[in-house]
A protein has these predicted regions:
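Extracytoplasmic cell-surface/polysaccharide-interacting catalytic and binding patches
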Residues: 2-238
């Protein structure tokens, strides 16, 4: 299928923490496969381990290149339009957000092009990405490091807990709308370009994570990523 690019936004559309120059060539209308290759991880065992019984709100569990999915973590899944699945606890706010987002998407319902992923699926995506970089002439270690910028190592990705979605639309305006309104529904723009040194992930304007309205609102108002929010929250508790 021929790939079709979305229209490039003009300067008047720019928003804070939004760096379109670096991603204008990556956001595709129908290239679902690109959006599948979206998370960053680390193959090495993390220093901080979690279990499903830790005193952490389910919606604020941290999964990234340093923090593996909690042991015995389980998600009850439900299907969304398009066939992808998410944790049933985020279904209602997700659908409310997508319905409202039609105003920024030419009155079309945005699509979830990647939701929950199994361990097998995540492994396949990671291996395929590594293989792609190997074909470009990179060594195995180089290919793995490059792959981690876009695909999380199995066991270290938010898609495997069912709380993250990759959203595709008909226009770039959708992503502007999501950045400015997703918090109202409990979702956060998970990987902004100016937080890469903290999240370890390149800017992904399509990737949204559910954290709850209260947390999402505070993160939006303070300009925090999830790692910063949780660190601040922990400091207050102590």
């Amino acid at each position: 299928m021929e790939e079709k690019m979305l229209p490039v936004p003009n300067e008047g559309h720019r928003r804070r923490r939004f760096h379109w120059g670096s991603i204008a060539t990556v956001i595709l209308v129908v290239a679902v496969c690109v959006y599948a290759f979206t998370l960053f991880g680390d193959k090495e065992s993390p220093e901080n381990t979690q279990t499903a019984n830790d005193d952490t709100d389910w919606n604020l569990v941290l999964v990234n290149y340093e923090n593996a999915i909690p042991e015995n973590y389980e998600s009850k899944l439900v299907e969304v339009p398009g066939g992808e699945k998410v944790d049933e606890r985020i279904y209602d706010p997700l659908m409310e957000m997508l319905e409202a987002a039609k105003e920024g998407n030419w009155d079309q319902l945005p699509m979830v092009v990647s939701g929950y992923r199994t361990q097998k699926k995540q492994q396949q995506l990671y291996d395929d990405k590594v293989a792609g970089y190997r074909k470009e002439g990179n060594s195995q270690s180089e290919a793995e490091e490059l792959a981690k910028q876009w695909v999380s190592v199995p066991g270290y990705g938010e898609h495997q807990i069912g709380l993250a979605v990759d959203i595709n639309g008909a226009t770039y305006d959708l992503y502007f709308w999501l950045q400015e309104n997703s918090y109202k529904y409990g979702f956060i723009f998970r990987y902004p370009g100016d937080k890469t040194d903290i999240t370890g992930v390149a800017e992904e304007v399509w990737h949204y994570r559910y954290v709850g309205v209260e947390a999402a609102t505070e993160m939006y108002e303070k300009g925090l990523c999830l790692e910063e929010y949780l660190a601040e929250r922990q400091a207050v508790r102590h």
